[in-house]
Every structure is written in C-alpha cells, then in structure tokens.
Amino acid sequence: MTRRAEFEMGLFVILQSMFLISLCSSQKPEEFLPEISPDTSPQPFLPFIAPSPMVPYINSTMPKLSGLCSLNFSASESLIQTTSHNCWTVFAPLLANVMCCPQLDATLTIILGKASKETGLLALNRTQSKHCLSDLEQILVGKGASGQLNKICSIHSSNLTSSSCPVINVDEFESTVDTAKLLLACEKIDPVKECCEEACQNAILDAATNISLKASETLTDNSDRINDCKNVVNRWLATKLDPSRVKETLRGLANCKINRVCPLVFPHMKHIGGNCSNELSNQTGCCRAMESYVSHLQKQTLITNLQALDCATSLGTKLQKLNITKNIFSVCHISLKDFSLQVGNQESGCLLPSLPSDAIFDKDTGISFTCDLNDNIPAPWPSSSLSSASTCKKPVRIPALPAAASSQPRLHDEGVTRLVIFVLSMLLVMLLS
C-alpha cells in the first residue's frame, strides 16, 4: 500500500471515528444550536457524514428501469452526468437552490424537447411521466446522486406532462406562437444582461400567454396555466437552440430568478432587538447577539453572491423595523459571506458564483465546486434611497465569478479556488462534534 493510500485510509477511519464519537456524546441536541433559540426555526439540513473524501462513493449497481419509458436517456448522457454531480448524495440539499434543482430542471426540459422531434409532442401523458421520472431517478442514483431528489427539488411526474397547458403538439405550437420573435430573443442571451433586460423571458411569457388562451375553459387566475405553458415553451426552445448552448441558456434564465430571492429563513430577532436598540448603548452585547443569530443562518444552505446581498438587505430591513437605526453590519463586521454555509470558520465562508456553475467530479479528490473565498465584501446596510435589492441596481459591486486575492494561493486560472469534498467532510464532522 502506497503512502497516499495509507493516508486516505487513515483519514477515512478518523472521520468515521469522529462521527461515531459525536453520536455517542452526551451533549444535548439544543447545545448544537446557536445562542438564540428561534420559535419556528428550521433544523439545519446537514448530512451526518460525507463519503470518503478521497474515494467518492458511487452506487455501482445497474439501475432497474421500468422498460415503459420512451425517452432516450442515453442521448443525454453528458447532461445526466452533470446532474448527478450537481446533486451528489449528501451535498444535494446544500446545492439544491443554486446547482442541483436548476440543472435537474434543465435536463428534463432538454430530454423532453429532444423526444418531441420523434413524437411531435412537447409533453408526456400521466402514465408515461411516472415511469420516465422514476427511471431518471434510478439512473441518477446509480451515478452518485441523492435518492431524495423528488423531495429536495419538489419534482413530480406532473412536471413532465403539460399540466394545465392546452397546447403540446409541435405543429399547433408553431402555428400559434411567433416563433421567429421567440428565437430572436432567446437564440443567444447574455446571462447578465438578460436578468436586467428580460428580453428572452418576456418572449417566453408572450408565447406562453398565447398558447394558454387556446384552453376551452377560462380561469379566474390564469397565472398557473401560463407557468405550465412556459415549461412547454422551454421544451420547444430546447429543440431549436444551438445544442451546445441550450443548457447554458436554460440555466441562465433560471439564475435570473434564483438571484432575486434570499432562500434563507430568518428566525425571530428578540435577542438582537434587546441588545442593539437604544442607539447601540451596548456594542459588545449587540455584536454577540448578531454573531449568534448569523451563526444560525450559516447552517442553512449555500448561496450565491447576489443572494447574499438579497439576504443582507432583507435582514437589515427587518432590523430597522425593530427601531435599530445604527449600521450594526458595519459595527459588528458582518460581510456577505457570513450569510452562507461556513467551512470551518468565517474566513472560509463559501459564496457560490452568481452565474450558473456546475460541480466537477475528479476521481482523486471527488466532487468540487467553485466557491468565492476571496471577496470580503461588507454587508450593506439598507438606506432609505434603496427600496429593494434589485438584481440590476445592487448597492455594491459583486463579481459574477470569484476574484483573485493576492494573499491567497492561485490554485486554478483566475484565482478560482475549488472547495473539495474533503473540506466539507471535516466541516460536517465539526458541526456535529
């Protein structure tokens, strides 16, 4: 056995031992939580332990397929492989909002679009959709993905059907929609400009609205039907766009929505309100309360740069409603990285890029993904002139991709640091020890 192999085996044994010790500890569950005990706070969705960091676990068993699904999954092997990496076992809940679920949705859209070239239909019937979704889940699990994607991403067999959209026939679709206008707007999008100008998104909305009007029965609120028709429009687009750009386009459109919303759940703020009011008379107590509160947020999920800005704005606005007028983000040195899952300590906070990105598999190091470990951007305190954290009118400049810091090692081009599975394995053990 080589020295490297000995090291890997020893490390794996240490990790497993630490995990077992943590389970046998007499420490009460409440002691794992931050100082604040929220009334309705979510339990941190963290797996107990990751697979061996150096030798990633893959379910090598052949998936048991139904044989009743007509979709050609083998024609989308690369897409499915990327999806399995983005939804890798224990990391799927942590990457769900930014990587896993958007990639899974794009994969389903593209596969259904490809199938329409043979069937002339942009949706499956209910029976087939159940078999096909089950088969895809089996294939993904066989490649290392989580077996709980239906819950993590709220994916149901109805997502493969037309749902309430009245048009699924390709010929009928093309005779109803201004396809030239749709293609012109979506043929080649800039992922940054599109989120502000919304040219492609508006074209998709127009097309979805047009085909939704073909329904025989009218609805008081047509928004659900239009959303269902948007899925049909995206499947048609997947057949017309350059194959090398389809995934990037769909992921780019998804990221426009992702970056507009803070995915964190904010528990009550009684401790902060009690310690940070009265013109900040007790700065030490205030910052201790803020640190305790933020430590709870740090156990929820990984988020992007722009989501962190949304979260900072949301939290700051809530604090202002408690009559906290001082910029306690500045006083207590709260940065944007403090709103995301932490890796060991606050200096290693992980903010994902605001542009679409994928996890990468390496046979030696396992699963890695790009984290912004270099940009220490202070969390902005909301001002009266800033009514909202608009994606296009951010109060601070945030790089779409991580910027290189001279004080940190350049492990890859452009100073991008890859956070490998080993680091997160250690994090998970520390959180539970």
From Swiss-Prot:
Highest taxon of source: Eukaryota
GO cellular component: nucleus; plasma membrane; plasmodesma; side of membrane
Chief location: membrane
Residues carrying sugar: 59, 72, 125, 159, 210, 275, 282, 323
Coiled-coil regions listed: none
The keyword Lipoprotein belongs to this UniProt entry's keyword annotation: yes
Cellular localization per UniProt: Cell membrane
Lipidated positions per record (GPI-anchor amidated alanine): 405
Signal peptide range in chain numbering: 1-26
A family per Pfam: SPARK
Topology of this chain in the membrane: Lipid-anchor; GPI-anchor
Keywords of this entry: Cell membrane, Glycoprotein, GPI-anchor, Lipoprotein, Membrane, Signal
Cleaved propeptide residues: 406-433
Protein name: Uncharacterized GPI-anchored protein At1g61900
